[in-house]
Amino acid sequence: MAVDPRCLLSLCSTISKASSAKGTNDFVKIGMELWQTAQPYLVQALGLQPPPPKVDVDAAVANAGDAHGEQPWVATPLPGQTVRALFIGINYYGTSAALSGCCNDVKQMLATLQKKGLPINEAVILVDEDNFPGRTDQPTRDNIVRYMAWLVKDAKPGDVLFFHYSGHGTQCKSRGDSDEKYDQCIAPVDFQKSGCIVDDDIHKLLFSRLPEKVRLTAVFDCCHSGSIMDLPFTYVCSGGEQASGTPHMKRIREGNDVLGDVMMISGCADEQTSADVKNTATFGTGSTGAGGAATQCITCMLMNNQSLSYGKLLIETRDMLKRKRFKQVPQLSASKAIDLDQTFSLTEMFSVDRSVQ
């Protein structure tokens, strides 16, 4: 599918008067201003990290008791439903691991969700860019753990949750609590002092208390992110990773079932790195400047297509990266065997393919 950059530019630049209010930030406008901030985005692999300390999930839940977010924009609410979102972008300023585009990724995702009218009641923004509009706090290990627990705190059937991470992803030797040789990790801004956060702990923080009929969408734009949420089902294609053969969902692990309806799109497979974009205007997302390739593709797909199926969203994201000569292959995993012909939605529960056990 050819993406017309003018289409998305028009969408981003046409701002509804009802989309912002006094005391809120207009992220669509901010996303447009990225046209003026072009700079290189250099990705460095962190290499194998030492196993970090385990996260005390009960303590994290207690610590999240008084945490709260802010309403980022005004939109028509979902009756009887709460919509929460957690955005994390880390550039690691002043360190040997420095990146340039991860905070821009958060701006681009916020702009996309605002333009689509997702009625977020509470948003938390953890970024290490001091002048980032609406920033909640620094993306330290303690803060990320606390606000992951906050995201799902008191969630009830019908609620809608959204999670976006852009930063370093890496691996560490497994702590021995799984059959895998390596754990996938995300790297907080203070990872060199406090350690990373492994996939096992991400799974427990987000899913151990998640009830049925809660919808959670997650985007991880980082290296080694294919199975970073340890979800039981993944998208597979009979024609291979890059092909568009017969797609279906497949169970890949037992014992990690999740009650809620959770879907994750990752920037790449576990063994891959998630590439950079030096000039994001080449993706037609209405912005330039540094940014993650997967974030730019996903936001472009969401803004240019109103009725993509789950399967088409992933295939066209992969195809766009392939056309731009990136080698990474985004992955889709879920808590249930999604009917891949179902129209993609950030708020609706899944239709399940009952043929997949």
Curated annotation (Swiss-Prot):
Site (Cleavage): 22-23
Keyword Transmembrane listed: no
Residues given in the record as Ca(2+) binding sites: 183, 199-200, 230
GO BP annotation list: proteolysis
UniProt superkingdom: Eukaryota
Description of how activity is regulated: Activated by Ca(2+).
Subcellular locations according to the entry: Recycling endosome
EC nos: 3.4.22.-
InterPro entries: Caspase-like_dom_sf (IPR029030), Metacaspase (IPR050452), Pept_C14_caspase (IPR011600)
GO CC aspect terms: recycling endosome
Knockout or disruption consequences: RNAi-mediated knockdown causes no defect in the growth of the bloodstream stage form. Simultaneous RNAi-mediated knockdown of MCA2, MCA3 and MCA5 in the bloodstream stage form causes a growth arrest resulting from a block prior to cytokinesis; DNA replication and mitosis are normal. Has no effect on VSG protein recycling. Triple knockout of MCA2, MCA3 and MCA5 in the bloodstream form causes an initial slower growth rate in vitro which reaches wild-type levels after several weeks of culture. Triple knockouts have a normal growth rate and virulence in infected mice.
Main location: other
GO MF annotations, alphabetized: cysteine-type endopeptidase activity; metal ion binding
Catalytic machinery residues: 168, 223
Keywords, sorted A to Z: Autocatalytic cleavage, Calcium, Endosome, Hydrolase, Metal-binding, Protease, Thiol protease, Zymogen
Keyword Protease attached: yes
EC category name: hydrolase
Family: Belongs to the peptidase C14B family.
Function: Cysteine protease that cleaves specifically after arginine or lysine residues. In the bloodstream form, may cleave inactive metacaspase-4 MCA4 prior to MCA4 secretion.
Protein name: Metacaspase-3
